[in-house]
Amino acid sequence: MEAFTKHTGLAVMIDSANVDTDQIIPKQFLSKVTRDGFGVHLFHDWRYLDDAGDEPNPEFTLNQSRYKGASILISKENFGCGSSREHAPWALADFGLRAIIAPSFADIFYGNSINNGLLPVRLSDVEVQQLMDEVQANEGAEITVDLEGLTVTSPSGAVFSFEIAGSARHNMLNGLDAIGLTLAYDVQIASYESQLPAWKA
């Protein structure tokens, strides 16, 4: 997966709490098991006025021209609640998002995001609201998320600190998913296997 060190990008917001995985990627789009092609269905029921997805909802933030190309999403508490579908971070990443900022995340969604190279950043309610206010007030507002420094810099230059488990930070900084992490120990694994009796190999 793509490493995440420091990213500056256009920010978009969804000013709602408890955004669940069925809203992120509705169940009718889960037939694929590969990670690509889900971005077009992201927030389908909010982005489109029709079931076919031919009529964009002009009121939904992700459809507004000022947010085109956004790569950082800001939302409210308990983002990613609901079912454990891994398609949710797949859809967010396929849409072009690199980081999600919220006061809290559902635990399974949080882990799935890290495992798929999408950085979930927890900030306080007050800090999240400040980011939303600044983004709303300034078209083209960009936010910087620095995983090395564990900071988020707002459009006005305010700096907020965040925490993440050391193992998760290491994996994201080095672009290591579960397979990549295993392959990092390829020499040790091969050495161990070479010492196994033939009947165990």
From Swiss-Prot:
Pfam families tied to this protein: Aconitase_C
Entry EC number(s): 4.2.1.33
Pathway(s) this gene product operates in, as recorded in its UniProt entry: Amino-acid biosynthesis; L-leucine biosynthesis; L-leucine from 3-methyl-2-oxobutanoate: step 2/4
GO cellular component: 3-isopropylmalate dehydratase complex
Catalytic activities: (2R,3S)-3-isopropylmalate = (2S)-2-isopropylmalate
Disulfide cross-links: none
GO biological process: L-leucine biosynthetic process
GO molecular function, one term: 3-isopropylmalate dehydratase activity
InterPro entries: 3-IsopropMal_deHydase_ssu, Aconitase/3IPM_dehydase_swvl, AconitaseA/IPMdHydase_ssu_swvl, IPMI_Swivel, LeuD
Keywords in alphabetical order: Amino-acid biosynthesis, Branched-chain amino acid biosynthesis, Leucine biosynthesis, Lyase
Family from the record: Belongs to the LeuD family. LeuD type 1 subfamily.
Function text: Catalyzes the isomerization between 2-isopropylmalate and 3-isopropylmalate, via the formation of 2-isopropylmaleate.
Quaternary structure, from the entry: Heterodimer of LeuC and LeuD.
Name by which UniProt lists this protein: 3-isopropylmalate dehydratase small subunit
Species this chain originates from: Shewanella woodyi (strain ATCC 51908 / MS32)
